[in-house]
């Protein structure tokens, strides 16, 4: 389909999209936790469910924030980062891992918040990550810093979370990679490859790239998540701003829906058959959470577009607590905050 036809589809979708704002919201804001003194944009979350603590990477503030959800306060800013990106919490050892802008990952004790270990990866930039609970392996995006070159050598670094050792790399091409998604019932990972405008398919058992699905529409893939039950892959694109639904067996396009500008995080809510996309990166005047309902595997509808604040693209879905969290950047004198939403039926 031509670029002109895609733009026509996008405009038609927007006319429906904006008209649904008066319906009952799938999310209700229940409180906002102030994050005083925190500057710049955020990147990713992790949560300690048993202790109800959140770890939030404030990349431009060069800290990881420890937030006590029960007390509703930020308890500490953990320093020592160039730019903290993604974070993973391991309940078994009560430790968490943080990827950094210099190609390292750092391990911290949850209780003392002290640094225990630093590991240098193969390349000089470490970003998004995905955990495989079956093998207890963690996959970290490891790319050359600042590269947009589609032929650049990059890796998915493999980390054994029992020992925190870097045990291997999965090579692929493309310098600009944001996120990966895991196939829970199978052996695949899906790479949102922005440099090549495609979805890379990795076999975790073979530790190799086994396929690539070029996108058939304009846009750069940023965030990706999978619905294992219906074999559907949800991809958030920028420029133009689209939610793309793919068949995860073949890569075939199922449908597209419009989303807000600057999408950065995406989550699949299997219990409610919903997709949440948070958007508002950088200089976007306003941030939003776009919520979609899966009618069936091939049909979707936009149910809400919830304003969250300027530069508020970082989010986390926690079905165990029935909460959805959004980090909102400090702007025009208003302090940064963590918004806590209740998920409605």
List the model feature ranges, each with a label.
Residues 17-345:
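Predominantly soluble domains enriched in secretory-pathway, periplasmic, or organellar proteins
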Residues 6-15:
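Bacterial N-terminal signal peptides
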Residues 1-5:
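Positively charged n-region of N-terminal signal peptides that target proteins for export
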